[in-house]
């Protein structure tokens, strides 16, 4: 038995300089697991609640001392002595202790930090790398990365309404080569922007944040960078978007302020379809407002066979909402953010539900990150096939890519890189 003998919660800082929660879990054998939780900028209204102190004079109200106190008191008392290898039972204990539907009492940030730290301690106790502990002998597939090389929307202070413009390397034989491709395109784009006298400052997720005249101009420039780096757009490298449409949906219209457009759901579907026809776009995330299910249905019927349609704010890693979406034929993919739901057990359940329905599951970071690289191990352990963890800059993003390189090395000859086949939801 891997009994839990000590739990320590603490307040640390994330990549935006805001407080977040870190937790250490110590086992009877002396083994320790440490985990830190991320935080989002654009959030779904039905996400599990991240507990903040609200004390205006300290970190602008964003302190997490209440969540830390819950770890060091109530949660510690409830799980002390439990077997760390019994993840499902431990997470069930946390859920029952919280007692709310949205984890608002203890805080999803407190619960997730403990859930992750326990898993890490148990993996260490078992002498297994974390991805192997999660997935057993079947964990051998590296994920295709969606690399956010231009930031807009809530992630940057520029004129772009769409939040993320991503490159997706798909023709490479290994993850290592896919990562090299992404880095080379990133540097080619930096040179193009610099030559034009445009900003090469980066946003929250490490992508550039220049002022383009339109989304079309941004995508065209990315195609130039792909070519400049020596790759073929549409063959070696595909494109992906995160619209984060809930952020610019007001008064029943999709208001693209950067382009002076106010569009209905049908008109915005036409807008996205035009982009998908013009550019090699393989994936669009949150293409409609989270509450605009009629719009989502229209978008899915229009593009769902040729473009991966990812629900982030739509599904918030929640199996109850995902089940409803599957039944109604909404989207064909789910974004998986561990802090949207608050425990590893619930996270894994969402991934499995998606797969059973023929939906893909894209493992994702948040805009406020830490050096914790657990999502890399989840992506491989659960054979998710896709990961979204930022650009090719900022160590809070690179830490996940570097962990995937280590995992690929550890797997050796049995490692596989799915490329285009990661998009099995497209027919």
Curated annotation (Swiss-Prot):
Family matches, as PROSITE patterns: ENOLASE (PS00164)
Transmembrane segments: none
Pfam families with a match to the protein in the record: Enolase_C, Enolase_N
InterPro entries named among the record's database cross-references: Enolase, Enolase-like_C_sf, Enolase-like_N, Enolase_C, Enolase_CS, Enolase_N
Highest taxon of the lineage: Bacteria
Listed GO biological process terms: glycolytic process
Binding site for Mg(2+): 242, 285, 312
Subcellular location as annotated: Cytoplasm; Secreted; Cell surface
Active site: 205 (proton donor), 337 (proton acceptor)
Named cofactor requirement(s): Mg(2+)
Catalytic activity: (2R)-2-phosphoglycerate = phosphoenolpyruvate + H2O
Enzyme Commission code(s) on record: 4.2.1.11
UniProt key word Protein transport: no
Cofactor annotation comment: Binds a second Mg(2+) ion via substrate during catalysis.
Pathway in which the depicted protein is active: Carbohydrate degradation; glycolysis; pyruvate from D-glyceraldehyde 3-phosphate: step 4/5
GO cellular component: cell surface; extracellular region; phosphopyruvate hydratase complex
A single GO molecular function term of this UniProt record: phosphopyruvate hydratase activity
UniProt keyword terms in alphabetical order: Cytoplasm, Glycolysis, Lyase, Magnesium, Metal-binding, Secreted
Main location, first listed in the record: cytoplasm
Presence of keyword Nucleus: no
Residues engaged in binding (2R)-2-phosphoglycerate: 163, 337, 366-367, 388
NCBIfam families, per database record: eno (TIGR01060)
Family from the record: Belongs to the enolase family.
Protein purpose: Catalyzes the reversible conversion of 2-phosphoglycerate (2-PG) into phosphoenolpyruvate (PEP). It is essential for the degradation of carbohydrates via glycolysis.
The protein's name: Enolase
Encoding gene per record: eno
